[in-house]
Amino acid sequence: MEERCFRLGIKTNYKKEIFMILNNKQNKTEFIVSKMDELVNWARKGSLWPMTFGLACCAVEMMHSAASRYDLDRFGIIFRPSPRQSDVMIVAGTLTNKMAPALRKVYDQMSEPRWVVSMGSCANGGGYYHYSYSVVRGCDRIVPVDIYVPGCPPTAEALLYGLLQLQKKIKRSRKTLYWLQK
């Protein structure tokens, strides 16, 4: 029996289709897991705890973004002093060859899931010191980077925009559902 769908104006047998979809056990499991993923991602994106890894002048702009004018606390972003308490690392400034092992060690100490934000042209690709013998040409050679914030130094608004983009990326992730399908 066909029934009319009021929103689309299309005739469909939607009751039978929904029953067929929910009758399958795997579809029920995927539905529950996807809703659980949405709930977990909602909690994760609303409580980002970044750890600062300030290496140069970009760190001043990072401190500026945490001050009262931009107030990252209203987005649930609270800076943490320890890598074991944080889930986001903001790399701000010129990364030297001598500092690269320390960056990797701090990254490894962070608990899963963890994200990295590369802030400024020096952290993104070496910046003005790109051709220097002692500079790593981008922190993505040491740790996997999720968000790049351009600028020299980037403004506090740019960092805020980058962190909001990271929240959108977290909202779209489906780690549990992918794990279930393997």
UniProtKB/Swiss-Prot annotation:
It holds the Pfam family Oxidored_q6. Its cofactor is [4Fe-4S] cluster. Its main location: mitochondrion. Keywords: 4Fe-4S, Electron transport, Iron, Iron-sulfur, Metal-binding, Mitochondrion, NAD, Oxidoreductase, Respiratory chain, Translocase, Transport. [4Fe-4S] cluster binds at residues 57-58, 122, 152. The keyword Iron applies. The keyword Hydrolase does not apply. Its EC number is 7.1.1.2. One of its GO terms (biological process) is electron transport coupled proton transport. Disulfide bonds: none annotated. InterPro entries: NADH_UbQ_OxRdtase-like_20kDa, NADH_UQ_OxRdtase_20Kd_su. Binds 1 [4Fe-4S] cluster. It catalyses: a ubiquinone + NADH + 5 H(+)(in) = a ubiquinol + NAD(+) + 4 H(+)(out). One of its GO terms (cellular component) is respiratory chain complex I. It is an enzyme of class 7 (translocase). NCBIfam families: nuoB_fam (TIGR01957), PRK06411.1 (NF005012). PANTHER family: NADH DEHYDROGENASE, NADH DEHYDROGENASE [UBIQUINONE] IRON-SULFUR PROTEIN 7, MITOCHONDRIAL. Belongs to the complex I 20 kDa subunit family. This is NADH-ubiquinone oxidoreductase 20 kDa subunit. It comes from Reclinomonas americana. The gene is NAD10.
